[in-house]
Design a protein with these regions (language model features):
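Intrinsic disorder/low-complexity signal
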Residues: 2-3, 102, 142, 236
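Receiver (REC) domain switch/active-site residues of two-component response regulators
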Residues: 232
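Substrate-binding/active-site clefts of carbohydrate-active enzymes
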Residues: 16, 22-28, 34-103, 110-229
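Aromatic- and carboxylate-enriched substrate-binding clefts and catalytic-loop regions
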Residues: 239-241
Length: 241
């Protein structure tokens, strides 16, 4: 080691280290919420019509139980059992979440979907009507930010739901604009490549520029439009794929 090296003093970390320390994602305490199960909605009776059969709206005091596989729906019955929580009822509990010391409120999927878990998206741009509306999301974001927290949504962009208009149109004909969004092959269960071979969750062909444009690349993409509504970031489902 030279005299110059000895007298140079301690090494200065690159600016990127300082930026990382200032990043709100670094070391944040994250509170995860399944909106349907978190806080009982006071308007439950008024929105019962949003759970048409074979969906079931359960009593808030009931304990979830494993159901049976529904061949006609290609899901388990417990996947379409609902407890009726929504975005307004979640907003009413923000003080509780704040007092726990949470830095980030992370919501499991809130977009339009067939099941209670929401990982089978029907439309990424719409909020499930039993949860509320995009205006409700904007109000939630404002209230979250007023408490010094961040709001993160679940980005389920590896696959969509089999009941989605995009998949149904793609499956109906090879000339559909959505045909290239999915990988069709009779060698797959259900005729299309699906996450974990779950036929209700056909995988998107992320390499397709049209899919990229719809999800994140386009000016009106899913990712950009929700960020404009006030959310702070995304948790990416199945990111390793």
């Amino acid at each position: 080691m030279s005299d110059e090296q000895l007298s140079a003093g301690p090494a200065q970390p690159p600016d990127r280290f300082a930026l990382r320390e200032a990043d709100w994602r670094n070391g944040a305490l994250v509170y995860q919420v399944i909106v349907d199960r978190f806080a009982q909605s006071p308007r439950l009776a008024a929105k019962g019509y949003l759970y048409p059969a074979p969906k079931r709206l359960r009593d808030w005091s009931e304990t979830p139980e494993k159901g049976r596989y529904l061949d006609d729906q290609e899901v388990w019955s417990h996947e379409i059992d609902f407890w009726g929580g929504d975005l307004p009822s979640l907003r009413s509990r923000l003080e509780y979440i704040d007092e726990l010391g949470a830095d980030v409120l992370y919501l499991c999927p809130i977009h339009l979907a067939w099941t209670n878990h929401g990982y089978d998206a029907l439309d990424y741009q719409q909020v499930r009507p039993d949860y509320g509306s995009r205006d409700d999301v904007r109000r939630l974001a404002e209230d979250v930010h007023a408490r010094g927290m961040k709001l993160v949504l679940d980005g389920v962009f590896n696959h969509m739901g089999r009941h989605s208009p995009a998949f149904q149109a793609a499956a109906a004909g090879q000339r559909s604009r959505y045909r290239g969004w999915f990988d069709f092959d009779q060698g797959y269960p259900g005729g299309a490549r699906a996450w974990a071979n779950a036929v209700n969750l056909p995988e998107l062909v992320i390499e397709n520029p049209a899919v990229q444009d719809h999800i994140w690349a386009g000016d009106d993409s899913v990712v950009r439009s929700w960020l404009r509504d006030g959310i702070d970031g995304w948790r990416l489902d199945v990111a390793f794929e």
